[in-house]
């Protein structure tokens, strides 16, 4: 069955907390960077406990970075990686498509969208979806970006650790070019300056 969390932010916070509990202590982040991450996790837990309204819920793809879409000749974008579908908040998919840590993941389609490009994409998305979804998603856009950043950051911490060992996350299962790109992107995303920049973006 397709997952359908009754409290999407609370479910995301629980998964992120479990990941950070396992991988953050040995991540080698600076004290300042660790403090930022822990502060944002506290924010997410507090926000999730207050935001219990599940709507608007739609079928979401979860892993909505640019590399998981194919652009057809008629200009339509088709999602091609249906590994993690869930009935969830569409704003989480929207956030995953535009925040830098997620948008830069793919070796060929990865990008670092500037603020103008990000905002233009969000505006186009809001105009394309049903009005009720747009209206109910708008107040959650910034919160969704923060939540998805934490989810993705936790994934990167796990990938950096487990990609170095044998197993399903091993970098040896990837081509050398893809493995090198993922490693560069993960290390850049875990850099102090990248973490500080993300924290600044949360206020914009």
Give each language-model segment a name.
Residues 1-42, 48-59, 84-89, 165-184:
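A cross-family kinase active-site recognition segment
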Residues 36-40, 113-117, 121, 145, ...:
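Soluble or luminal CAZymes and related metallo-dependent hydrolases
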Residues 4, 132-148:
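All-alpha amphipathic helical-bundle segments outside canonical DNA-binding/catalytic cores
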Residues 29, 83, 107-111:
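A ubiquitous short alpha-helical element
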Residues 91-132, 146-165:
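Active-site activation/catalytic loop segments of kinase-like enzymes and analogous catalytic loops
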Residues 27, 132, 152-204:
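ATP/Mg2+ or Mg2+-diphosphate-binding catalytic cores
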Residues 43-92, 98, 105:
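Active-site acidic catalytic loop and adjacent metal/ATP-binding pocket
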């Amino acid at each position: 069955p397709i997952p359908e969390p009754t409290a999407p932010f609370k479910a995301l916070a629980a998964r992120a907390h479990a990941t950070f509990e396992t991988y953050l202590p040995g991540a080698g982040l600076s004290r300042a960077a660790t403090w930022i991450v822990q502060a944002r996790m506290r924010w997410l837990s507090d926000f999730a406990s207050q935001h219990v309204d599940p709507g608007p819920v739609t079928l979401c793809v979860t892993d909505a970075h640019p590399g998981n879409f194919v652009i057809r000749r008629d200009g339509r974008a088709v999602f091609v990686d249906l590994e993690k579908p869930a009935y969830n908040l569409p704003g989480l998919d929207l956030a995953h498509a535009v925040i830098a840590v997620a948008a830069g993941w793919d070796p060929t389609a990865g990008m670092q969208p500037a603020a103008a490009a990000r905002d233009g994409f969000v505006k186009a998305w809001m105009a394309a979806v049903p009005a009720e979804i747009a209206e109910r998603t708008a107040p959650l856009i910034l919160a969704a970006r923060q939540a998805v950043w934490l989810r993705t950051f936790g994934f990167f911490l796990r990938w950096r650790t487990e990609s170095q060992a044998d197993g399903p996350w091993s970098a040896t299962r990837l081509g050398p070019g893809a493995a090198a790109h993922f490693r560069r992107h993960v290390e850049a995303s875990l850099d102090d300056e990248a973490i500080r920049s993300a924290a600044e973006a949360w206020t914009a």
